[in-house]
Curated annotation (Swiss-Prot):
GO terms, molecular function: structural constituent of ribosome
Gene: rpmH
UniProt xrefs under InterPro entries: Ribosomal_bL34 (IPR000271), Ribosomal_bL34_CS (IPR020939)
UniProt record similarity statement: Belongs to the bacterial ribosomal protein bL34 family.
Region of interest called Disordered, as start-end residue ranges on this chain: 1-47
Record keywords, A-Z: Ribonucleoprotein, Ribosomal protein
Gene Ontology cellular component terms for the protein in this record: ribonucleoprotein complex; ribosome
Comp. bias regions, Basic residues: 1-22, 36-47
The keyword Aminoacyl-tRNA synthetase belongs to this UniProt entry's keyword annotation: no
Annotated signal sequence range: none
GO biological processes: translation
Protein name, per record: Large ribosomal subunit protein bL34
Pfam families: Ribosomal_L34
Length: 47
């Protein structure tokens, strides 16, 4: 049985477009995520 290809193909532009700060701030739910991570004291808020 073949395992199949690796599913994680790193791409910095897609990473920041999907998970970045600007995209998080563009929706209400995303702002909630960022504020929750601030409240928790995360060193890194977004990707």
């Amino acid at each position: 049985m073949a395992k199949g290809k690796r599913t994680f193909q790193p791409n910095n532009r897609r990473r920041s477009r999907v998970h970045g700060f600007r995209s998080r701030m563009s929706t209400r739910a995303g702002r909630a995520i960022v504020s929750a991570r601030r409240r928790k004291g995360r060193k890194s808020l977004t990707a």
